[in-house]
């Protein structure tokens, strides 16, 4: 089917040294505006509440205050910064307060220099050749990407990750996506990143585990460097680059897996995992964090939506692991170390994760009021695409 959607294309930027200085000024100025008006809104509300008439500052009031702020000689440096990006920071702050008052989010936090650095360009962005043109960068910032950047750009988010600069370009797209066929239940795990009810099992990437020894070595070297020294700063960058490599590898892995699943299945049933609860278990906390399940879930959600496919969620506390997928018996003494599920009632024996994924599938089908399907063999096209992407795939 053909649908209209807002898509994002992330490209790496290659700014000149002068442009890097201006980009850093944009990061710092937008961070300053966020913190300044977060403090202003908090103070204004507290003072008005003390007077018995609690009131808040909205976007329009803060926009007016920003204009007044720029007229103060102390803040004349704000004129070097794209005004539209500063306005967008005020809008984002206003949205954060709206989410808080609707109880959808916690109270907005102050931004730190050590946090994610970004600013938003809401309009007036375009591409000229191999350069991205945004306000205050009329000469264009160089980029390299195989993808063609569309003309109808809705918004650009400029970010820095360690020493790399990126532009996330949001644009409207009308594309044809074919809905997959078949229904599958998916069990997320640590021994196997994913086990599907049709027998596909994907080994985990374990991006952090692969870099763990090197990371520990570089962190030991950091502890030996003098605080405030140039060598310590360089060592910090080394460590940040390792974390960057881990994030990049995990993102690439999750994209490949989520794309293959969304492409080949029309209905996917998953379990709503209590990831925060699992991270409190010290024996598996590091492995749970290393999987990147939240990122995978987010990717799968929007890719299924593109295809008008169904993503069904079952509850966290459903007995998917302890239930026999053949007779429904609950095995209360099942241990985490038990990799094979054996039912004493019907003598059914199966891989533990495959048994759980079949239960997840059945629970999802019952939830939407359809009959339980029969077990289907591995779809060869799905397994082939996953293997082609460099992933380690097994069939059960």
Regions found by a protein language model. Name each.
Residues 1-86:
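Gly/serine-rich nucleotide phosphate-binding loop at the start of the catalytic core
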Residues 2, 6, 175, 286-287, ...:
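Positively charged, low-complexity nucleic-acid-binding target-recognition regions
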Residues 46-75, 153-155, 161-184, 188-297, ...:
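Substrate-contacting helices/loops that form the catalytic groove of nucleic-acid
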Residues 59-161:
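Acidic carboxylate diad motif detector
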Residues 125-126, 130-136, 192-196, 339-342:
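Short polybasic amphipathic segments
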Residues 128, 161-162, 197-200, 327, ...:
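Short acidic-glycine loop/turn motifs at beta-strand connectors
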Residues 131-141, 169-174, 199-200, 347:
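Secondary-structure transition/turn motif
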């Amino acid at each position: 089917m053909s649908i209209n959607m807002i898509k994002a294309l992330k490209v790496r930027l290659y700014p000149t040294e002068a442009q890097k200085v201006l980009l850093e000024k944009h990061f710092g100025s937008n961070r300053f505006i966020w913190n300044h008006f977060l403090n202003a809104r908090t103070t204004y509300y507290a003072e008005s509440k003390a007077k018995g008439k609690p009131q808040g500052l909205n976007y329009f009031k803060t926009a007016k205050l920003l204009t007044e702020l720029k007229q103060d000689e102390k803040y004349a440096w704000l004129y070097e910064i794209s005004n539209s990006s500063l306005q967008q920071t005020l809008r984002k702050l206003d949205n954060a307060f709206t989410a808080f008052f609707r109880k959808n989010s916690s109270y907005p936090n102050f931004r730190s220099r050590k946090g994610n650095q970004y600013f938003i360009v809401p309009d007036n962005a375009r591409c000229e050749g191999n350069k991205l043109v945004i306000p205050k960068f009329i000469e264009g910032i160089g980029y390299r990407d195989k993808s063609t950047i569309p003309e109808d750009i809705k918004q650009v988010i400029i970010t820095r990750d360690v020493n790399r600069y990126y532009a996330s370009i949001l644009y409207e797209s009308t594309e044809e996506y074919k809905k997959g066929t078949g229904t599958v239940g998916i069990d997320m795990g640590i021994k196997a990143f994913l086990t599907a009810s049709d027998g596909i099992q994907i080994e985990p990437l374990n991006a952090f585990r692969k870099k763990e020894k090197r990371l520990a070595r570089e962190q030991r070297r950091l502890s030996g460097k003098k605080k405030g020294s140039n060598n310590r700063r360089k060592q910090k960058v080394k460590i940040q680059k390792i974390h960057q490599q881990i994030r990049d590898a995990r993102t690439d892995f999750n994209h490949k897996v989520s794309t293959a699943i969304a492409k080949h299945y029309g209905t996917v049933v998953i379990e709503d995992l209590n990831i925060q609860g699992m991270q409190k278990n010290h024996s598996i906390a590091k492995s749970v964090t290393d999987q990147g399940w939240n990122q995978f879930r987010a990717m799968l959600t929007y890719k299924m939506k593109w295809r008008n496919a169904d993503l069904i969620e079952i509850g966290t506390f459903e007995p998917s692991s302890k239930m026999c997928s053949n007779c429904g018996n609950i095995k209360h003494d099942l241990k985490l170390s038990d990799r094979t599920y054996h039912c004493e009632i019907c003598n059914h024996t199966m891989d533990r994760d495959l048994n759980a994924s079949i239960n997840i599938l059945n629970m999802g089908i019952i939830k939407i009021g359809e009959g339980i399907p029969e077990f289907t063999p591995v779809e060869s096209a799905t397994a082939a695409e996953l293997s082609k992407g460099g992933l380690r795939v097994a069939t059960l």
